[in-house]
């Protein structure tokens, strides 16, 4: 997802009436579309001194590399990279082979209430961490994402209270959640581009595949109970669009190298989130 934006070029030739009779051979490449280099052409006409013609810079010479989704904004670049890390069963753009148990189709999962509770508790720790970083930070990049409407920690608190009322014991956070939480804290201090990658993938993945997983798990073990974790105050599509615009705005200030660094963090985001998701099946 490459684009070529033509750039007007000009050919500067010393003024000479004899040049009106000069034409480029049809078998020769048009000098305006030669490969990136300065082309020097020597021409002798009617025994006159050789004339030097300098071909102008071509559009191809000036055209910078385009990244998949770049023309639509940086969020589309992040989406493109994320989708490629899915399996074919998870997304049509997926390129990853199914290896881990949580990567199998959800219909084949065998979730347990105990495992689901571990997943919810560890998820809450991650969302608590994200949202506390955003709310308490004076860093301008993070300030853009305060009170987006996508926040999940409070919703998860409500759900865990419901499970407690049903007689379930709420477990303590496990290693996957604690490890991810600590990693996010470290990134927030020293690597804002990488942190934003995790912010995007955590919230946007939950609003898409996360909802589907929640629905399927509820069908299997919760008698179709819809948890607050999968509900939003307001129109979800608009909340997501608002955050997309903020993300694109923030990324406009980044260099290409910083953008690439953000994209490269996607795989780690999937790794940490996958370890927490796997708890559902534990």
UniProtKB/Swiss-Prot annotation:
Widely expressed. It catalyses: heme b + 3 reduced [NADPH--hemoprotein reductase] + 3 O2 = biliverdin IXalpha + CO + Fe(2+) + 3 oxidized [NADPH--hemoprotein reductase] + 3 H2O + H(+). Residues 1-54 form a transit peptide. Heme b binds at residue 86. One of its GO terms (biological process) is heme oxidation. One of its GO terms (molecular function) is metal ion binding. SUPFAM superfamilies: Heme oxygenase-like. Signal peptide: none annotated. InterPro entries: Haem_Oase, Haem_Oase-like, Haem_Oase-like_multi-hlx, Haem_Oase_decyc_pln. Induction: By salt treatment. Down-regulated by jasmonate. Pfam families: Heme_oxygenase (PF01126). Activated by ascorbate. Its EC number is 1.14.14.18. Optimum pH is 7.2. It is found in: Plastid, Chloroplast. Disruption phenotype: Long hypocotyl, incomplete chloroplast and leaf development, lack of photoreversible phytochromes and lack of phytochromobilin, the phytochrome chromophore. No cotyledon expansion in response to bright-red light. Increased levels of jasmonate (JA) and constitutive expression of JA-inducible defense genes. Increased sensitivity to salt stress and no acclimation response to salinity. GO terms for cellular component: chloroplast. Keywords: Chloroplast, Heme, Iron, Metal-binding, Oxidoreductase, Photosynthesis, Plastid, Transit peptide. Key enzyme in the synthesis of the chromophore of the phytochrome family of plant photoreceptors. Catalyzes the opening of the heme ring to form the open-chain tetrapyrrole biliverdin IX with the release of iron and carbon monoxide (CO). Produces specifically the biliverdin IX-alpha isomer. Can form complex with heme, is ferredoxin-dependent and its activity is increased in the presence of ascorbate. Plays a role in salt acclimation signaling. May affect the plastid-to-nucleus signaling pathway by perturbing tetrapyrrole synthesis. PANTHER family: HEME OXYGENASE 1, CHLOROPLASTIC-RELATED. Belongs to the heme oxygenase family. This is Heme oxygenase 1, chloroplastic. The gene is HO1.
């Amino acid at each position: 997802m490459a684009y070529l934006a033509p750039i007007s070029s000009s050919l500067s030739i010393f003024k000479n009436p004899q040049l009106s009779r000069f034409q480029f051979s049809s078998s020769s490449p048009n000098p305006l579309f030669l490969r990136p280099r300065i082309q020097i052409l020597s021409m002798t006409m009617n025994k006159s001194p050789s004339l030097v013609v300098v071909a102008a810079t071509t559009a191809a010479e000036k055209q910078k590399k385009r990244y998949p989704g770049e023309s639509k904004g940086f969020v589309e670049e992040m989406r493109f990279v994320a989708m490629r890390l899915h399996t074919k069963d998870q997304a049509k753009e997926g390129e990853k082979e199914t290896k881990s148990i949580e990567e199998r189709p959800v219909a084949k999962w065998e979730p347990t209430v105990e495992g689901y509770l571990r997943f919810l508790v560890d998820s809450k720790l991650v969302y608590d961490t994200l949202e506390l970083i955003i709310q308490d930070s004076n860093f301008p990049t993070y300030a853009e994402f305060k009170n987006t409407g996508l926040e999940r920690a409070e919703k998860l608190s409500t759900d865990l209270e419901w499970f407690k009322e049903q007689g379930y014991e709420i477990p303590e956070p496990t290693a996957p959640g604690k490890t991810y939480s600590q990693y996010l804290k470290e990134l927030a201090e020293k690597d804002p581009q990488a942190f934003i990658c995790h912010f995007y993938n955590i919230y946007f993945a939950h609003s898409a595949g996360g909802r589907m997983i929640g629905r399927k798990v509820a069908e299997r073990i919760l008698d179709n109970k819809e948890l607050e974790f999968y509900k939003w105050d307001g129109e979800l599509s608009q909340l997501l669009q608002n955050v997309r615009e903020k993300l694109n705005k923030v990324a406009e200030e980044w260099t290409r190298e910083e953008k690439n660094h953000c994209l490269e963090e996607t795989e780690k985001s999937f790794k940490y989130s996958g370890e927490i998701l796997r708890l559902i099946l534990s």
